[in-house]
Amino acid sequence: MAKRSLAKLNTSDLSGKRVLVRVDFNVPLNDAGAITDDTRIRAALPTINDLIGKGAKVILAAHFGRPKGQVNDKMRLTPVATRLSELLSKPVTKTESCIGPDAEAKVNAMANGDVVLLENVRFFAEEEKNDADFAKQLAGLADVYVNDAFGAAHRAHASTEGVTKFLKPSVAGFLMEKELQYLQGAVDEPKRPLAAIVGGSKVSSKIGVLEALIDKCDKVLIGGGMIFTFYKARGLAVGKSLVEEDKLELAKELEAKAKAKGVELLLPTDVLLADNFAPDANSQVADVTAIPDGWMGLDIGPDAIKVFQAALADCKTVIWNGPMGVFEFDKFAAGTNAIATTLAELSGKGCCTIIGGGDSVAAVEKAGLAEKMSHISTGGGASLELLEGKVLPGVAALDDAA
């Protein structure tokens, strides 16, 4: 069901209104406490600027890290407030706590177009418990609710789900709307052929998404460490490559399911091997039927890259989740980089390319190709759950579109 969005609320709906906006500001910091990547902050700017332009009083709620329901000075949102202020070119007032007298006083002092950032909502254990009283206190600061934190939409927490019971309208922000449009659109009404590229080290973390994608896709390409579980299930030797012994039957079932449905399931034909798990390891290319003892696969091979590129050439929609190899080591990044380059080229030819969160996003950014993709998802777990066809509590709680 489509959700009501911020785009449908105009100045007369929002001017002078206190708007609680759930954002995803869970950014990485270095040891000195400085932000190393502000992508998530920048991703929320369209929603924040729209609300400022419509004369709203913008109250931002966010979590940061895992403080386990206690105040942790290392997880305060102070550096985020500073960076956001720079990006908006206007002051951002941060509260000492997300609820209570200080938050109330700072919200009451707001003029239209002002921005207040509430302190880390996870300093209260009630946030993750979706406690109704806590949600009511948060909601009490505002008149309207906007959820723009897609990365937290798969959690039923007080600031993502609970507050919607007390605030109407409750709508999707621009980032949330874009995520739903691309990810749901790719699954529900894709332009075909539809291909999914699924990588990463473990089958276990991608079982749900693999099963769902085999149901929906024309082609499924598998890379990353999980391929060795499939090879071992076929009876092939895999050296000392990563294998999930308890998932061998599942790998067989997934291959059989794809075959029964007429879905092209592609595994690499060759792999790049290493003699140990290190950036400077000795390496060699081997056919997957001839992996020697004592070696481990850390990337897909050159022949596999060509086969994958050929399979993707005619696709109109491609979803990518998970790297092809250990791309953090330059020596074993060729497969991942080749997929990133191929998708960038396909985008230029009108293919809808969706990078589904997590390490694939880091890989695309490392390759300098982020701008070339149709959509880069900001959600890791949320992206996977949406692609699996699961209902995201933070989305379900929003008002339905009229």
Swiss-Prot record:
Associated pathway: Carbohydrate degradation; glycolysis; pyruvate from D-glyceraldehyde 3-phosphate: step 2/5
Which reactions is this enzyme annotated as catalysing?
(2R)-3-phosphoglycerate + ATP = (2R)-3-phospho-glyceroyl phosphate + ADP
Compartments where found: Cytoplasm
The molecular function terms of the Gene Ontology recorded here are:
ADP binding; ATP binding; phosphoglycerate kinase activity
Please indicate if the UniProt record lists Cell inner membrane as a keyword.
no
- Gene Ontology cellular component annotations, sorted alphabetically: cytosol
What family is reported?
Belongs to the phosphoglycerate kinase family.
Q: What is this protein called?
A: Phosphoglycerate kinase
Give the species. Synechococcus sp. (strain CC9311)
Q: What is the lineage of its organism?
A: Bacteria, Bacillati, Cyanobacteriota, Cyanophyceae, Synechococcales
